[in-house]
Amino acid sequence: MERLKQLEEKRRQLKELRERRKQASLFPGSETMGHHPTEVHAKATMVSVSVQTDMEEGSKIQEPQSAYLRRKEVITYDKGIQTDQIEEEQLQENENHTTTDAVAIETTAADENNKDKAENDQPRLELAKPFLVEEAAATLSNASFARLETEVSASGQQAPSNMQQDKDNLMQWNMVSENLQSETDCDCIAQEYDPGKGVLVVVYLRLPPADLQYASSEAAWSVVNVVKCDNASGRNGLLIDMVEFRGTRIMTATILRRYHPESNVISILLATLTGKIILYELRLKQKKPETPVVYVVQRNMVARHYFQHPVVAVIETSSVQDQERVLVAADNGNIMELSCLDLTVLRKPQQLRPVPLSQLLSLENDTCTYTERLQRLAKFDEVGIACMAYTSEDPQYVWIGGEDGGIYKVFWDQPGPLYLSLDNNGFQPAENHSTRVTGLEFHWDDARRLMLLLSCSTDWTVRLWDARAGKAIIGAPLLLGGPVLRARWLEKNNGGENSRTLRCQVWCADGRLVVVNWAFDAKTSLYTATVIS
């Protein structure tokens, strides 16, 4: 019974559902009514539509067109497998090419790494800042670099890294720059070049205007430039150091210790108008142990005031290690021997004096040129010195160029004052310079065993002498168009024994730099001078 009741109940429910479905089909917008209850819907109307299915006459049958379906592109890969056997020679060749390419790549990479490492390890140089000296006391330290270096070498100890001469030394670096002092506002008064170390020293002088030369606010300026270069002209060189002296007029600059190229110290002796001499030193020192190596240029100056008159001559007489000596002379006739290392006095000042008049009374009948010159000098208490020369071939004598134009051969090793000799120790030429002698320099002629002496003067002439024979060995003196300030020997030119020539360089007061060629004539046994530039 209960089963029948359940079936009846289900039939009733099914019938109600069918009736509700019929009512819902009469209202198509009933689905949206729940979302828009306020919206008013129009009544549904029935529309009949007829569709023709028969084909009209004369119409063409159109073929059905297939719909275009867009398909995704599919990428496929073909894998080929070689089944033939590869020849052994071709395989070996391919392996060789691969190995060669790999080695080349590794070599190139190694070279690039080494190059980068070498550039990073390249030593660097730090120059000292320009220095200005305004006081009379110009000494920086009494412990000179040259003395310290010599003591280390004499003790037998190994020199420290800052004293060793290696490939990174200042003297051997290739440096290019153009930093020379401008010559427009300065006058070049001294120039010295050391080819062994490739160092050029140039001294410039700047004077106040003529209308202000006595003003208290104006003073003379001297500028010393030290240049690393490959030639004496100073072109394409690097300015290593520069020192300015305010109120000091430097007369000469001489490079000392030339015969010690292994030294790491540059020694320069500066002579001033007031008689002060300055030992100006430069050395290279490693800053600190680091990579890359950094070198610093250090400067030192030792000043001494031994003279009361202008210093006009500086001659190095000994180049023995730890015994380097230099002769320094003032224009009033004082001569002193000093150490090149620290300017220590090795021989007290000696005064050059003329022959006493009492000794000349016995020579009244002697009318030679030298005796007449001695008689004129006897009126004074001293002999003015303009220049000086020295040669190791005759070490006991020193040659003096006088302000009166004479050339005097003086015996150096004598106590007390230095007196001129009555016979000038064998040097009595028939002719001599008429005015101040500005330069003397020796040269040894190996071919003819001659000791040649080159001299120049403000009388516009350059002369050549045989120092041992005491006579001139030129047909006529070389006459230039102005006063000559300095002359020095250049390299030799050997073109055979009879055609051998010598060269010298001459500086004139008008700024000209002249090169003179001296050719020996075997017939006359004389030298002939020719200006070649």
Swiss-Prot record:
What is a GO molecular function of this protein? dynein heavy chain binding
Q: Where is this region: Disordered?
A: 1-36
Q: Which UniProt keywords apply?
A: Cytoplasm, Cytoskeleton, Microtubule, Repeat, WD repeat
Primary location class: cytoplasm
* Localization in the cell: Cytoplasm, Cytoskeleton
Q: What else is known?
A: Present with 752 molecules/cell in log phase SD medium.
Q: How does it assemble?
A: Interacts with NUM1, when DYN1 is present.
What exactly does this protein do? Required for viability in the absence of the kinesin-related CIN8 mitotic motor. May be a dynein intermediate chain.
| Classification of source organism | Eukaryota, Fungi, Dikarya, Ascomycota, Saccharomycotina
Q: Where are the WD repeats?
A: 380-422, 432-475
- GO cellular-component term (any): cytoplasmic dynein complex
Q: Which gene encodes it?
A: PAC11
State the disulfide connectivity: none
Give GO BP annotations, semicolon-separated.
establishment of mitotic spindle localization; establishment of mitotic spindle orientation; nuclear migration along microtubule; transport along microtubule
Provenance organism: Saccharomyces cerevisiae (strain ATCC 204508 / S288c)
Q: What is this protein called?
A: WD repeat-containing protein PAC11
Annotated membrane-spanning segments are none
> Which InterPro entries does the record associate with it?
Dynein_IC (IPR050687), WD40/YVTN_repeat-like_dom_sf (IPR015943), WD40_repeat_CS (IPR019775), WD40_repeat_dom_sf (IPR036322), WD40_rpt (IPR001680)
- Domain of life the protein comes from: Eukaryota
Compositionally biased spans, kind Basic and acidic residues: 1-19
